[in-house]
Amino acid sequence: MTTTEQRLTVESRNGIDYKVADLSLAEFGRKEIRLAEHEMPGLMALRREYAEVAPLKGARISGSLHMTVQTAVLIETLVSLGAEVRWASCNIFSTQDHAAAAVVVGPHGTPEEPKGTPVFAWKGETLEEYWWAAEQMLTWPGEPANMILDDGGDATMLVLRGAQFEKAGVVPPAEDDDSAEYKVFLNLLRERFETDKTKWTKIAESVKGVTEETTTGVLRLYQFEAAGELPFPAINVNDSVTKSKFDNKYGTRHSLIDGINRGTDVLIGGKKVLICGYGDVGKGCAESLAGQGARVQVTEIDPINALQALMDGFDVVTVEQAIGSADIVITSTGNKDIITLDHMKAMKDKAILGNIGHFDNEIDMAALERSGATRINIKPQVDEWTFDDGHSIVVLSEGRLLNLGNATGHPSFVMSNSFSNQVIAQIELWTKNDEYDNAVYRLAKHLDEKVARIHVEALGGTLTKLTKEQAEYINVDVEGPYKPEHYRY
């Protein structure tokens, strides 16, 4: 038995495997799930539409996505459409423990007799625990998983890298400059290779497709595709308009402020704020902070995004130009080493540093931890780091997603858009698998419009309907799609 397995064991009750913080939190979680269902019209509409068809019957979906109340509604939607599901979070801090408990117990179970879905997630996992949970999510009794629903690409990477190393006959040793997380990842694969030399290959051969939620995970998928290492089709959910233009912007506009307020409770008005990156997420960050009266500056590598920022009223600067005067610094790029140790040392005393990109390497936390700076934990996911010269900075969520670590993430309504796309993408790959090659696809425009239409109606909007003559004049169908694929919205 390995070190990890000695400390971490799967619990099982009434035939349901799980590892969560506390099943007694299930009633609280169920109350919040019921409220969330009211705010997630897209998912509820899909339940009604497909209730009698069960299009996901036979699907064994391994899901790696933030285990929140909103995700609970997604999971139970997948189950209502016929799927079997196993779940883990895609972030060590993002799990809402009451939501995880409620999903395990299910709407008709009790903590003593759960009747829900296997979940392996709790808030505040170590890296070792995180990857252990990911393996449990992908490890099914009997037949292996045949679908993956991913956020950030960790589940997909675990399967594909595991299969790749099995084919090579060896798991490579960690390099000195590898991140602490990658070393844990390799160690898990090495331990598993000692006991089962074909585990990941079997899963990779069984999986019919993956649907990916976020920018970072999509990048990984395109890298696998370019290298000829993608053994199944993938749908890029992130670039559906009703995801990227809503979740990424409007969701961030709501949840960034929530995370900063809960983490620090500082007045934002009047503060100098530096936003690194002006993509859809960065736009939401800048808009929310400017709305609070902050003086916002933006960094960008892309002249088009930089011009957008300037036209929106934000100065475009480099990190080096602004880091010494910023009161709050937020990274939102999807890239690495955006804020280095030298940048952190140059920050003002008690300046706040946070990240809202998917991974923790936008801020070089590894270098900060090695620097000799003293860390004092103020409260969960809020740390003060003091340098040798006596000045300090406040780091939120250890450089990971602050909106989920310090708060509860995006609100239900905007996640209904994103998760409706996920459900539709899962149905698409499961029911029409032979129509897809081993490549990365986006959802068809008419499906994007379907998701938007549901939510327009839920907000009380009334769409104008084209006449037949008007539709012919602009060369579209009366029922859509209304825009070409290259339209940017």
Swiss-Prot record:
Asked if the Swiss-Prot or TrEMBL record annotates the protein with the keyword Hydrolase, the reply is: yes
Instruction: Please give the pathway this protein is involved in.
Output: Amino-acid biosynthesis; L-homocysteine biosynthesis; L-homocysteine from S-adenosyl-L-homocysteine: step 1/1
Amino-acid positions noted as binding NAD(+) in the UniProt annotation, renumbered to this chain: 214-216, 248, 277-282, 300, 335, 356-358, 403
Q: Name one GO cellular component term.
A: cytosol
Taking the first listed entry, what is the main subcellular location of this protein, grouped into a coarse class? cytoplasm
Describe cofactor binding as the record notes it: Binds 1 NAD(+) per subunit.
Q: What is its EC number?
A: 3.13.2.1
Keywords, alphabetical: Cytoplasm, Hydrolase, NAD, One-carbon metabolism
Residues noted as binding substrate in the record, renumbered to the chain: T68, D151, E213, K243, D247
What's an example Gene Ontology biological process for this entry?
A: L-homocysteine biosynthetic process
- Entry similarity comment: Belongs to the adenosylhomocysteinase family.
Q: What is this protein called?
A: Adenosylhomocysteinase
The gene for this chain is ahcY
